[in-house]
């Protein structure tokens, strides 16, 4: 039986392979379909499936539990270069999908992410990825212009730079950040946090 906060769920007992003699009658021709019944269509955990950025939630939670905060930050930044910003304004879809909520309450995923992201604001524990430079051609000589210094444009420039390109971001406002700076009120998202993360992207 599986205990949940609403009681318990009883599953039918299954015979163990060691208890029966294996034969053709035990073989299912549609075993592939039957095997997938308990899996999500995406083949990933519910929290990662619910996350719009598809961050490996279970991965960085495990790393954080082991005290490997920089490695957890590295894992988050594979999909999201603004961990501190998202730690403050994320609507926590991962927590809504967390299966731990069927037992007692969902894991405080956003609080863990926010704590990990704070490490990025500290110069000593900051994670700045190394450039992946092709061995044959070296760095790319092509110039790339990114129009707009909002979260999408800055993310684009970040991942291009990581691949060995040298992008230039063009922004008409006095400072980059887009809606992070101009659309979200300061009581919801501190502007110094946005500026700090943009400075990290410049590195």
Walk through the language-model features, giving the residues of each.
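Ferredoxin-type iron-sulfur electron-transfer modules and their immediate structural context
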Residues: 1-140, 191
